[in-house]
Amino acid sequence: MGTLHLKQNPLLKITNKSLINLPSPSNISAWWNFGSLLGMCLILQITTGIFLAMHYTPNITTAFSSVAHITRDVQYGWLLRGLHANGASIFFICLYFHIGRGIYYGSFLNKKTWYTGIMLLFLTMATAFMGYILPWGQMSFWGATVITNLLSAIPYMGTNLVQWIWGGFSVDNATLTRFFTLHFLTPFIISSLTTIHLLLLHEKGSNNPTGLNSNPDKIPFHPYFSYKDLLGVNLLMIGLLTLTLFLPNLLTDPENFTPANPLSTPKHIKPEWYFLFAYAILRSIPNKLGGVLALLSSVTILFIMPTLHTSKQRSATFRPFTQILFWSPTADLVILTWIGAQPVEDPFIMIGQTASVFYFTLILLLIPLAAILENKLLDY
């Protein structure tokens, strides 16, 4: 019986090149752990999601009670639902940290990898939004109505597009069925795109905290970074299990424990916490189309990051002005997240508008200008 050789077997060769003998920069920090954590989160979400789909019924008359049935009657159904719902929150925390690290250390200059990453972000956001609709509680129904209705701001075709998505003249059974179908399908598309993301990353190799060429100082991925990633996975699982077992409903909206009722509108319609920053930007503009464009811009701004890079240095490690201006929009996003959860009244309206203007000004104007100033200082 022949032995399997890592470098000869066609399947093992791919694994060997991407997980075992992958040349990695020796100085990458814990900020580089979030990629593997996102992979773990995706596997967890797909696994728990498949088991939940076995018991869920995508019908407006039975969807809410089927979720109650999962949590009460199915063996460990409460755990599956808790892991899936809170796993989404952990997924987005890792995702935002991963993007933040990419911006701070200039990883966006690897354009192909960066653009596939943004596509992954959009797909993940769409998947999470559709998943929020499935329990068919009050916030699910009204969230679906309000967010899909934003497309009606598109000139000429907006209304027809909304009705086409709804499958009728309002959010109804057809909407729930198609959202369930797409929510089940998109994670597999995300998995495929993740593979492309990794292939494009390994084409040039990982960036590192200094932003310099790390070719003279590479070490194999295994055992150094494989064990480092395992530590990250363990810490993440401890956090997720603590949240799921002790505070399973901490991040869910109380309104969603009430079955969907088209005749009763909740006092304050809002999405899940990880979309609140974009929702706050949307609400801060009085015009509907303007709000939708600002909402889209808050995320699509990531596409022009390589264009906005005016510095001679790739990373922000040795750039003090850029560091201050990096943490300013980070704090600004926290403020926007808080504002998105507040009712539409003063002083929240004013704070939201100020924070929205500040967000775009920092990214589009102040950070590129600071980089130009730092370039000038390097000449002295």
From Swiss-Prot:
Heme b b566 binds at residues 98, 197. Binds 2 heme b groups non-covalently. The chain crosses the membrane at residues 34-54, 78-99, 114-134, 179-199, 227-247, 289-309, 321-341, 348-368. It holds the Pfam family Cytochrome_B. A ubiquinone binds at residue 202. One of its GO terms (cellular component) is mitochondrial inner membrane. GO terms for biological process: mitochondrial electron transport, ubiquinol to cytochrome c. Heme b b562 binds at residues 84, 183. Keywords: Electron transport, Heme, Iron, Membrane, Metal-binding, Mitochondrion, Mitochondrion inner membrane, Respiratory chain, Transmembrane, Transmembrane helix, Transport, Ubiquinone. Its cofactor is heme b. GO terms for molecular function: metal ion binding; ubiquinol-cytochrome-c reductase activity. InterPro entries: Cyt_b/b6_C, Cyt_b/b6_C_sf, Cyt_b/b6_N, Cytb/b6-like_sf, Cytochrome_b, Cytochrome_b_C_euk/bac, Cytochrome_b_N_euk/bac, Di-haem_cyt_TM. Its main location: mitochondrion. The cytochrome bc1 complex contains 3 respiratory subunits (MT-CYB, CYC1 and UQCRFS1), 2 core proteins (UQCRC1 and UQCRC2) and probably 6 low-molecular weight proteins. Belongs to the cytochrome b family. Component of the ubiquinol-cytochrome c reductase complex (complex III or cytochrome b-c1 complex) that is part of the mitochondrial respiratory chain. The b-c1 complex mediates electron transfer from ubiquinol to cytochrome c. Contributes to the generation of a proton gradient across the mitochondrial membrane that is then used for ATP synthesis. Heme 1 (or BL or b562) is low-potential and absorbs at about 562 nm, and heme 2 (or BH or b566) is high-potential and absorbs at about 566 nm. This is Cytochrome b.
